[in-house]
Amino acid sequence: MKFLFIVQGEGRGHLTQAITLEEILRRNGHEVVEVLVGKSSSRRLPGFFNRNIHAPVKRFVSPNFLPTPANKRVSLMRSVAYNLVKLPVYINSINYIRQRIEASGADRVINFYELLTGLTYFLFRPSVPQICIGHQYLFLHKSFEFPKADKVSLALLKFFTVLTSLGAKERLALSFRYMKDDPQNNIRVIPPLLRKEVTLHEPYSGDYIHGYMVNAGFSENVMKWHRQHPGIPLRFFWDKWEEEPVKRVDNTLSFYQLDDVEFLRQMAGCKAYASTAGFESVCEAMYLGKPILMVPAHIEQDCNAYDAKKSGAGIISSDFNLQQLLEFAKDYHPNRDFVYWVRGAEYTLLNLLESDSSNYQQVLFNDCLLYTSPSPRDISGSR
């Protein structure tokens, strides 16, 4: 079978999942004919993606979330205003996606949570079946438990998730643990897609804390904590592309440009891991048996962190309070069930992708009403 990938380019999670799925498909005799990746002025495609993906990569301009002026949590108002101005550009991108779907000769389109893919299918109804993959589709599962959060923000998150999957035959929801499928919402629950490099690493406990932050503004938190605890080695990765590959602050604090090989190597040998609660790196740390401090940067990561904590991954904080992480690490016990769950990903995924999806109904726009109509009591209660 021939597959076309369309990938949200924000962060490293969806990019890593695309690399992993391409490896699985190629290993089993299938072909990825092309990879379309969303781009924006505030994000750069990491070098590890171009080095590891085999199919031709093409870019298109896509919506993205802007951080607050302090470059920490995502600012919803700034993001909405910015993306409204860019609407004409996004319309061009939708037309481009439609053209690439038609020209690719693909048997399936795999959508890694890219909004414009859903809008393309809503507006043009391409004949090639679309299958959506991402942990975010678990937010639409009838049994998913949300953290206590602003009801409007949660409704918007679910609305956005539905928009990404308009016209999809199936939603494949990556999960920290086994859950029953939700056929009513076209949701199949599957294990996380971890790269084989993660499974090949032999973890050990070093003397340093490893970390990753999507928004570089969190580096101030890390440096503040470091000044108070200079004896504890810290090695953090960030997306601050204007900096040198390794910014060595002193003998015990360094910031690294995102490099997947080095990132995983350092994770395998760390004492503990601190992150802005992106799904992919939390899964990698869980697989390697590392205690985790999760510092969510937006509502999606609030949900990730809450769900990961339920699975025994670690603790949640509003900032990089690494002392909390060190205390938690003393009594931490890895979740071995997670490792067994992850090892079933390839078999489960191939079964689903190779099956005939013609019996599934497309997810239409009126599905949005199922997820984004909070009651007046919910809205008033969120203030």
Predicted regions mapped to residue ranges:
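A short, glycine/small-residue-rich beta-strand->loop->alpha-helix junction that serves as a flexible
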Residues: 7-19
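Conserved nucleotide-sugar donor-binding subdomain of glycosyltransferases
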Residues: 72-108, 115-116
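Active-site-proximal region of nucleotide-activated glycan assembly enzymes
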Residues: 128-189
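Donor-nucleotide binding loops and adjacent catalytic segments primarily
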Residues: 193-269
